[in-house]
């Protein structure tokens, strides 16, 4: 399968891609390499992933509609996994434009690319904020 993973240099993206590469999947990873998290850590993760011939990286911001359209038009993805986001409720209040660009505009570009190119499966990460205020120490599948 050919799989697109957005946010590939992040913690979850990096570890997911390592597992997918262990299964001999073909992975195209994209990340904007912004400074929300340590850029050197992101680059070190990418250096490890690039050792596998089934991985290729493109520095693309998912909010860039034309770059995303070109990426989808030039690839036939079987699966798209969207892990690119600006995380954190506090950050969204302090930096609303960056939050909207990544989490709304960017995600819409992922959705539209997937729709127009007839991607079979789309997986996206949500937020722990969807659980609301929880008085317990942890959430269960029944909460």
Predicted regions and their residues:
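N-terminal Rossmann-like NAD(P)+-binding domain of SDR-like oxidoreductases, especially those catalyzing
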Residues: 1-143
